[in-house]
Each structure stands twice: as structure tokens, then as C-alpha cells.
Amino acid sequence: MNPFFEPYNTPHDTVPFDRIRLEDFEEAFMEGIRRDNEQIEKTINNPEKPTFDNTIINTEEDKGYYDLLSRVSTVFFNLLSAETNDEMDALAQKMQPILTQHANDVRLNPRLFERIRQVHLHHRKLTPEEKMLLDNCYEGFVRSGALLDEAGKERLRQLTEEASMLSLQFSQNLLKEQKAFTLDITDEAQLDGLPETAREAAALTAKEQGKQGWVFTLDMPSYSPFMTYSTQRELRKQLYMARNTICTHDNAENNIEICKRLINLRREIAQLLGYKTYADYVLKRRMASNTRGVYRLLNDLIDAYKPTAQKEREELKKLFDKSLTSNPSPLTSKMMPWDSGFYSHKLQMKKYNIDQEMLRPYFELSKVIEGVFGLANKLYGITFKENKDIPVYHPDVKAYEVFDKDGSYLAVFYADFHPRKGKQGGAWMTEYQGQQWEIKDEKLRIKNVRPHVGVVMNLTKPTEDKPALLTLGEVETFLHEFGHSLHGMFANTRFESLSGTNVWWDFVELPSQFMENYSVEKDFLRTFAFHYQTGEPLPDELIDRIVKSRNFMAATACLRQVSFGLLDMAYYTQREEFTEDIIPFEKQAWKKAILGEQLPDTCMTVQFSHIMAGGYAAGYYSYKWAEVLDADAFSVFKKHGIFNQETAQRFRDEVLSKGGTEHPMTLYKRFRGGEPTIDALLKRNGIKAPKSHKPSKSH
């Protein structure tokens, strides 16, 4: 029998990956749609007066874990990012329009919406969480076109179905292009400057691909060390241009027209729903409220960070010019983008005598896992135990049971660490089962259904004779995604659609970026950073250098993120049809946050998954917004102790466990005692506030 049609009978009802076949998905999708439609018919044909219980609860259950369509969709689309193949891609192309049509059928059903509207108008005696669910349900239908006339609804169907297909095509094109390129080296002299770990990894990749020598790819664990350490400027340029021109070539994977069409589709959707721009539509349900709030934040950051970033660039350029004088290059004498990583490393060594390779031996993955889990234990008292009886979708994946401080079961946690064929680049948190209370009609809390969450990353792989040795940056990435996972694990709400990370998108990055702070905390590093061969702890002098170098090129990094935010807003504040050429438009859109050379052929937009296919359209500013929040929140821990359990418990109770049950600023203020200011972020980064700056609330 199709495993989606029967009880899983696995530990904690985890997904039976070992029993799922490709053909099971389509069958389960179609049966899920049939059951959904059947349930909706029951709801709208109910002769009783619409109530919260017989209408809103039913609608909530139609998209929860116990709903077949939700279950199969969750598994399929998670695997499409983490473990796909040509057959999965083809099925996605087939199912996407069917699923989008079904979603439209639900949200544009006039009889269902009328019942929801009646409850919204006449509800009584709801708890705050029930009221939030009702408001979200009503708003969700309105924002999906429920108030449009028939012609408007039909047009909206066309737009959303096309947008969903193009988003999928964008992602599939990007993955194909990223995996297609390799830099093959057979002359060992061309490896000059590369550390042993990078050489060994490249040799292993070559062996896996049946090639001689060394193979470098566009996956970050391969790309980043090459750009940082290789003395071969020509090869750095080749690799840089390969990465930064993907999906711009004259082939089937070109994303330029897809991006233009997505921008226009989203603008038209927003205008059809009564908004001037897509950004206005998105920001209606964000802490930032409107485009003014977003631009105010981005411009404040430019004012604060740009002077320091200019100094950082001048310092880098001096080192480049000095190096070029003693070692002339056949390429241009200007510092180019493919030089930045190489000379940043040299400058960091000169100023702090520290680099990522120096630290790798102390960041063996198994020890890092112990450290991250240990941090969660110190803060919240939770423990992790690997359970090999829990099915996984790839041998690389580990599954853990998570137990609360009282020993009770809390969650299942999956960890998928390394790059491989069929896996998207980057890092993300995922969820296979959301938390909710399983209740009966009398509203008794019967069972707290616990979440199944995980992290999917592309960290350095082990080699034939070495374990996986991470960079400090990869440790930070792990902490970031683990922070999202804690948000999911600690969820304690009645309704799944309000639990865990189901919050406004400019709040969702707070728990993740908060955890990044620990990557440069001495007392945390001392808990797990031991040499993988000798067992010696990371020397105090190295830890001191890590802490001192924390803000190295911080202003440049900030402007880079701001530039992405500006680009995002430039696309989604369009009021008329977007017809411009993507590449030159991009260069102009982020110009005031870019200090270096802009190359005419490179393009970020065509690989900018966040804003084209990842849900961050008109929302990329969220990363900097959340950074203001996380710096402010972590200052409380710095004051009371970074492992202070009382503070951690308040953070868990007031923020992490609440999900989207209240307005995010209400939750934050309850924890912090007031609204955040940008000041803590400036202080953390060692940035002097501009003269015009006054301590201000986050926007």
C-alpha cells in the first residue's frame, strides 16, 4: 500500500522514507486533493450557522499534518530541494500547476469564504490565539483574491499558476547550472596556495567523477577556499565568472526572462488585489509595515557603515597595489572582484594572524555537533540522542530524538550536512511535521503533537583520510540554521499554522541570527573546539584572535547585504510593466551600496533564489531587520551571562514557543522590556553612529 495512506508505524510517526517510492507521490497528491475537496464540501454544506469550530477549525485541519495533501506535499518539496533527480523534477513540473489550481479552488471558493466572513463578522468569546487564527484565515482568503469579481478571480488564477511554474523552473535551472560547471586541474602547480584540505577535497571530487587530478565546483565548500587561497589569478577569475554568470548563457537554463516575468506577474497580482506595488502587498503583513520603513532601515545602515566600508576597501586596495608591484599580473592592474577574497585573507593574516584553515583542525564536525547540542543543553536543558531506527532519505542524514529538561520527548531533529548531486546549494531549516495540540470538539488539550524539524546544509565533506573539518563560517551557518530549528522545536501553540517559524518573515530570522552570536564567544568555543588528532583545546591566543577579528570587514559585509535588499526592493516597487534589461538594472539598483568594480556580464538576480523562488520577494531586508533585533536581544544575555538559564527560559517562553500567536513586536517587547534600537548592532560591529544619528527604534 502507498505509505502515505496508512499510519507510518515509525518512531514518533516520522516519515517512512525507506518505504516511499516515486510513484507514491502522484497517487497521494491526487488522493489528497480529492479528500480536501470532500472535506470542503462538508464544511460549506453544513446546515448549521458558521462558527469558529465548524468552519475555521475545519479550514485549519485541511492544511495541517493530519491532512494527506499537506503530508505528501511537505515530503515531496523538501526532497525536491535536498535529494532530487530528473524523475522528481519531471513530477514537480507535472504536479505544480495541479497543486496551484487546487489552492486557488480553495481560496477562491465563494461559499467557503462566505462562511469564514460570517465568523469574522460575528465571532464571540475567542481566545487571543483563536482570534489570531481567525484573522489570519480571513486575511489569507482576502489576500488570495476572495473579494474579487469572477473576472478578477480568473485572472488571478492565471497569474498565480504561471508564477508557481516559473518559480519552479527558476530553481531547477539554477541547480542544473550550478552542478554542470567544474574547474578541472591536472597540473599540480596550479594548486599553488591552496591548503591541504582543499586539495584533498578536490582530489576526492575528481575520483568520484572518474577524472584525473583535481576538480573544483561551484558548491561553497569547494568554491570558497579556492577564491580565498589560490595564487592563480587567472583561475580565480575563471571560477568567479563561472559562478557569477550562471543562468545568463544562451541555453535552456537562462533565467533572465523568467525573472522579468516573475517581477511583472507579482506586480500584476498585487495591483489586482488593490495594492500599488508587490512590496506594498507583502509589507502589509510585516513588522516594517511599508516601503518607507524598509528604505529607512537600509539607508540608516548605509549611512552608518559606508564610511567604515570605504576605509576597509582602501586598506585592501593598498595591500593589492603593493602585491602587484612586486608580482605584476598579466590581467588588469585594478583590484577585481575575484581578488577580494584572496586579499581579504592576506589582510586578515597581517592584522590578526588568523585564517579559516588554522581553525579547521579544531572544528571537526562531530565535535561541532556536540558543541551546538551542548549549547542548547546549557541554555534550555534539552538533550539529543541519535536514533538509527528513524528512517532518513539519504545515508548522510542523521536523525535525533530531542528530550526536554524534564526528560519528556520534545521533537525529532534531522541533520543533513554535506553537498551532493541533486541537492540545492546554501543552507536552510526544514520541517516535516509542525507542532499542534490534538483536540476534540470539547476543546480539551488531549495531546501536544511534537514537531519534526531539520537542517539542510552544504558543509565541508570528509575526505578519504580526514573527518569533516569545518571553517568558523560553517560553524556559524550551523548555529544559524539550528536557531531556526529551536524555534520549531520549542513551539507550543494550539494551531499548527501559528506554531514555530510560522511568523512574519521579518521576525523569522531573529532566532537564527541570535544563535550566530555564540560562534565568537570564548566560553562557548572552549566547550567543543579540540584538535581532531591531538585532542588539544583551541589555544586561548587563537580564541582571542577570533574575538578580535570578529568585525574584520564587517562594514563591507553589511553593505553587501544591504545591496541585496536594495535590489529586491527595486524590483518589487515597480508600478508599471518591467521591461528593462536585468543586468544593467541590477547594477544601478544597488549602486549606492557597492564600492567595488561592477562587471558588465555578471548577474546576481538570475540566481537570487530568495527573492525569485524562495519566499523572500520584497522581504530580503528581513536579514538586516532581524540583525537589529538579535543584537539587541543578545545584549541581554551579555549582561546576565551568555549561558544564563533564566534569561534563556524567558526567551523560550516569550519568543520561541509562541510562534505567530501574537504580533511579533508584542512578543519581543515582552522579552526585552521595550522596542529594539539599532545601537546594539552598531556597538557589536564596532561602528560609530553617524553624527546625525539618534538612538532610534527599529523601523
What are these regions (language model features)?
Residues D67-V75, D135, E139, S340-Q348, ...:
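Short, hydrophobic/amphipathic alpha-helical patches that form generic packing surfaces
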Residues F17-A28, F52-T59, N251-N255, V294-L298, ...:
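Membrane-entry segments of alpha-helical transmembrane domains in multi-pass membrane proteins
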Residues T460-L479:
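Short pre-active-site segment immediately N-terminal to the catalytic Zn-binding motif
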Residues I33-K125, L559-Y571, R575-K591, Q598, ...:
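C-terminal non-catalytic alpha-helical accessory regions
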Residues M1-R21, E27, E31, G213-V215, ...:
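C-terminal, non-catalytic "cap/extension" segments appended to globular domains
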Residues M1-E31, R35-D36, S81, M88-S289, ...:
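His/Asp/Glu-rich acidic catalytic environments and adjacent acidic regulatory segments
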Residues E129, L133-L134, Q172, K176-T217, ...:
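Active-site-proximal, well-structured secondary-structure segments within enzyme catalytic domains
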Residues F5-D13, K42-N46, E139-S144, Y352-I354, ...:
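Short, charged/polar, low-complexity loop and linker segments
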